[in-house]
């Protein structure tokens, strides 16, 4: 496998940075891993043709990672990754979000509609095939357009060859669009909920502790993959059986010490490690700032309603969690980028690059002027993108009515929608509105309109506010009240009844929610069209800047940015010092749960039966062998980002001893610049997971089916 390391041969591997492609691991990588304590033969770590550790790692759903921990398709992932699934099964009478869920038999496991688990099947370098088909593109937009079509053709050809609806094929770019791989996955669509801890365990600490260390969150949930009788992926059927995986990971209860080897394998979503300083400024001011302001307002309104009503809390729990996660991430990122001086680091890199280009003559001619072109483009797009972001966050991602009404002004779409069988149409609408509360959205809409009026140029949003100013004296609340009183869109029964009318398209074309939605999407489309040509020098610059820096620094490790494909990171168990006279240890224990427990708090109120177990202190076989305590979480120097949630943390022998679930506040700049002295991966200790399953859930059948050492 080492011979395939095309781009990274000769690089001096570093343990403190890198989301490495397993098929590109070099001799230097392996030597560094072994120096840190790794013991397995490298072929036992990654080999798609025979059982290996990496075979146990899966894409869970659409944006998380999981790990197979039994010969019967048992999957461990994070609680926040399984949150949507748990919420989908929760009702006021059966509140699994709050109370947890335990299945004591296969038949009690709950099928989750729409949830998939994907296993990596193959990966093939198609860079030469793609570049050979390029037809002298005039600019970067045309180049990317040609590449997209070539990739689609390659995907279609491979899908046709595989002839399976349960195979997913995709071509993904790497190294800033300088390399391409064609990847296939086996996709299992019969996935069932097996176990979930109470919400006060799985989300212990809530927003307050999110992205923070020390941590005491039991962030895990358990699912099972089912297959047909031939052990192949299949849609849900009562006749399906637990999947027998190629490899399942061994679970280790041995524990750990400072500086022990730790390795993550997962599917990190996105990083931007090689962007210049002006791109960082754009991220902070034109993307993060609008997200922080708008979501903060929206979430305050949501939270008040959720605290007042249990049904609303259940409906909005998942939406709130998704929104608040990257709201707080954006706050932390901006603070860390400033505190750690990332802009100055980037400017120093740019100055060094410009000096190298100037000194290299014709050799570096292709890179001349690319930074100044990119800087000019960012200056032009900044204010436009900022306003576009406010509009998107507030009226497309903030209030829900605008997205709900999208397309209902198109008569052809309405006629097609209305032509469906009544039962099918009713089910579809019911599914769409399952977690929607019109009265709450009615409160959100005026707040979102107000922020758009404050932050977006008046002439750009005049189509929205001319009516509000003329008919309602500029009063956004009065406008929102009238819209919800006169529209059928917020109410599923009214919408269904309207769609069954022969003149449904005509009625909906005049609906106030549809009229608002049409205006919002027209304005947003105008923004997008204005921004599109400005991205051309940026896309071109990013590709060439990466290629140029690699030429400038041939011995420097430059692992490809994350792109939701399988990566590994290796490091060690280690604490850190976030400030003068402050030292954080590398693990937490159950004592911290008792210290944080607060019956008056919605975030720190421990579930009563679980609290009794913690107070009792009978850890059994799950106690640490050295100190006798129940370890809850630990931190490591691994390099992860969003998408790594649920990633198994493997020890030196390739055994799972934790599940990665978060990063630390002081290093929220990590997606842009890795800071080895501060950046840590926060991991739930597998022994805490097993303690919860065993002692609280009394679910010995799950313990028995795992390989635990």
Residues covered by each model-derived region:
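Terminal presequence/propeptide segments associated with secretion/organelle targeting
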Residues: 10-709
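Bacterial N-terminal signal peptides
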Residues: 1-8
């Amino acid at each position: 496998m080492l011979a395939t390391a095309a781009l990274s041969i000769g690089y001096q591997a570093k343990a403190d940075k890198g989301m490495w492609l397993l098929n590109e691991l070099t001799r230097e990588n392996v030597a560094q891993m072994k120096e840190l304590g790794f013991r397995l033969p490298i072929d036992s770590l990654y080999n798609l043709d025979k059982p290996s550790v990496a075979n146990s790692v899966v894409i869970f759903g659409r944006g998380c990672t999981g790990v197979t921990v039994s010969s019967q398709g048992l999957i461990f992932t994070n609680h926040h990754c399984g949150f949507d699934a748990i919420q989908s099964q929760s009702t006021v009478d059966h509140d699994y979000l709050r109370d947890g869920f335990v299945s004591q038999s296969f038949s009690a496991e709950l099928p989750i509609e729409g949830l998939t688990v994907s296993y990596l099947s193959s990966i093939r370098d198609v860079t030469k095939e793609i570049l050979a088909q390029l037809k002298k593109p005039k600019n970067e937009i045309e180049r990317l357009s040609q590449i997209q079509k070539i990739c689609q053709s390659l995907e279609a050809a491979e899908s046709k060859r595989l002839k399976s609806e349960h195979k997913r094929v995709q071509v993904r770019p790497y190294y800033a669009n300088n390399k391409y791989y064609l990847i296939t996955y086996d996709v299992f669509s019969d996935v069932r909920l097996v176990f979930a801890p109470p919400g006060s365990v799985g989300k212990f600490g809530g927003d307050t502790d999110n992205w923070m260390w020390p941590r005491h969150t039991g962030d895990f949930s358990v699912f099972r993959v089912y297959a047909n009788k031939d052990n192949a992926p299949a849609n849900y059927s009562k006749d399906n059986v637990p999947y027998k995986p190629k490899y399942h990971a061994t679970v280790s209860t041995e524990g750990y010490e400072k500086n022990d080897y730790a390795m993550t394998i997962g599917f990190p979503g996105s990083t931007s490690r090689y962007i210049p300083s002006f791109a960082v400024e754009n991220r902070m001011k034109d993307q993060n700032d609008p997200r922080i302001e708008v979501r903060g307002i929206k979430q305050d309104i949501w939270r008040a309603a959720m605290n007042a009503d249990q049904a609303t809390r259940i409906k909005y729990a998942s939406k709130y969690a998704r929104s608040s996660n990257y709201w707080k991430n954006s706050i932390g990122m901006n603070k860390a980028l400033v505190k750690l001086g990332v802009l100055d680091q980037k400017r120093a890199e740019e100055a060094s690059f410009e000096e190298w280009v100037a000194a290299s003559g014709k050799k570096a001619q292709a890179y001349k002027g690319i930074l100044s072109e990119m800087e000019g483009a960012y200056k032009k797009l900044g204010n436009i993108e900022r306003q576009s972001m406010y509009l998107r966050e507030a009226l497309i991602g903030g209030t829900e009515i605008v997205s709900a009404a999208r397309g209902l002004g198109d008569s052809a779409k309405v006629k097609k929608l209305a032509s469906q069988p009544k039962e099918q149409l009713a089910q579809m609408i019911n599914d769409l509105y399952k977690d929607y509360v019109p009265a709450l959205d009615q409160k959100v809409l005026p707040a979102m309109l107000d922020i758009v009026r404050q932050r977006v140029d008046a002439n750009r949003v005049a189509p929205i506010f001319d009516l509000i100013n003329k008919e309602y004296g500029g009063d956004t609340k009065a406008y929102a009240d009238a819209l919800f009183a006169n529209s059928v869109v917020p109410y599923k029964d009214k919408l269904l009844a309207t769609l069954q009318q022969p003149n449904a398209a005509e009625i909906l074309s005049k609906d106030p929610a549809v009229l608002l939605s049409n205006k919002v999407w027209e304005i947003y489309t105008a923004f997008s069209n204005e921004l599109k040509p400005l991205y051309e020098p940026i896309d071109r610059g990013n590709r060439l800047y990466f290629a140029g820096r690699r030429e400038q620094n041939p011995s420097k490790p430059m692992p490809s940015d994350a792109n939701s494909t399988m990566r590994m990171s290796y490091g060690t168990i280690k604490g850190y010092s976030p400030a003068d006279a402050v030292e954080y240890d590398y693990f937490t224990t159950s004592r911290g749960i008792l210290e944080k427990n607060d019956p008056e708090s919605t975030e720190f109120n421990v579930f009563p039966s679980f609290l009794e177990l913690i107070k009792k202190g009978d850890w059994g076989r799950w106690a640490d062998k050295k100190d006798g305590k129940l370890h809850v979480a630990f931190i490591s120097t691994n390099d992860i980002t969003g998408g790594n949630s649920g990633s198994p943390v493997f020890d030196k022998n390739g055994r799972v001893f934790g599940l990665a679930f978060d990063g630390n506040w002081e290093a929220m700049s990590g997606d842009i610049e890795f800071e080895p002295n501060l950046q840590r991966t926060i991991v739930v200790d597998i022994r805490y997971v097993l303690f919860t399953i065993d002692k609280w859930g009394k679910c010995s059948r799950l313990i028995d089916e795992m390989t635990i050492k």
